[in-house]
Swiss-Prot record:
Lineage: Bacteria, Bacillati, Actinomycetota, Actinomycetes, Mycobacteriales
NCBIfam families for the chain: greA, PRK00226.1-3
GO biological process: DNA-templated transcription elongation; regulation of DNA-templated transcription elongation
Stated role: Necessary for efficient RNA polymerase transcription elongation past template-encoded arresting sites. The arresting sites in DNA have the property of trapping a certain fraction of elongating RNA polymerases that pass through, resulting in locked ternary complexes. Cleavage of the nascent transcript by cleavage factors such as GreA or GreB allows the resumption of elongation from the new 3'terminus. GreA releases sequences of 2 to 3 nucleotides.
SS bonds (residue pairs): none
PANTHER family found in the cross-reference section: TRANSCRIPTION ELONGATION FACTOR GREA (PTHR30437:SF4)
Keyword Transcription regulation: yes
GO molecular function, one term: DNA binding
Residue ranges the record marks as coiled coil: 50-76
Organism annotation: Mycobacteroides abscessus (strain ATCC 19977 / DSM 44196 / CCUG 20993 / CIP 104536 / JCM 13569 / NCTC 13031 / TMC 1543 / L948) (Mycobacterium abscessus)
Name of the protein in its database record: Transcription elongation factor GreA
């Protein structure tokens, strides 16, 4: 996350991300020990194990920073309990440009909070589509602009609270 933004998370998602952060922080000494062990193997220019351990450390530190920023700027709340209104944490079904036969179902949430099994697409409330749907009621049509500049009409068919 490059710019600071508030992210809505359920308590369950917050706890899951916090546990991941705690595990990554606890794993720091393990990676540091592996780097030291690989460093002792000799010439660092040709030491693949050393470079792999350093790469792993870099990826882990990047994820730690990402999780810290996310959790520091998270708004923790309950998933919506209200049906019929598109809110962060809602599973919505929509159709585009008046084509009622072509529907799409997705979760309005952040990628970090999103569906673990990958069976449901996730659109951020701050994305053009997600933002257009926030607070829309079933049957309401809204418009949003896609990256190529085209305006798209989207109609909310249903909105239900997401349950993990």
């Amino acid at each position: 996350m490059t710019d600071t933004q508030v992210t809505w998370l359920t308590q369950e998602s917050h706890d899951r991300l916090k546990a991941e952060l705690d595990q990554l922080i606890a794993n720091r000494p393990v990676i540091a020990a592996e780097i030291n062990e690989r460093r002792e193997e000799g010439d660092l220019r040709e030491n693949g194990g050393y470079h792999a351990a350093r790469e792993e450390q870099g990826q882990q530190e990047a994820r730690i920073r990402q999780l810290q920023e996310l959790l520091n700027n998270a708004k923790v709340g309950e998933a919506p309990t209200q049906s019929g209104v598109a809110l962060p944490g809602s599973v919505v079904k929509v159709y585009y440009d008046g084509d009622k036969g072509d529907t799409e179902t997705f979760l309005i949430a952040t990628r970090q909070e999103g569906v673990k099994d990958g069976k449901l697409e996730v659109y951020s409330p701050s994305s053009p589509l997600g933002g257009a749907l926030i607070d829309a009621k079933v049957g309401e049509t809204r418009s949003y602009t896609v990256p190529n500049g085209t305006e798209v009409q989207v109609t909310l068919v249903s909105a239900e609270p997401y349950h993990e």
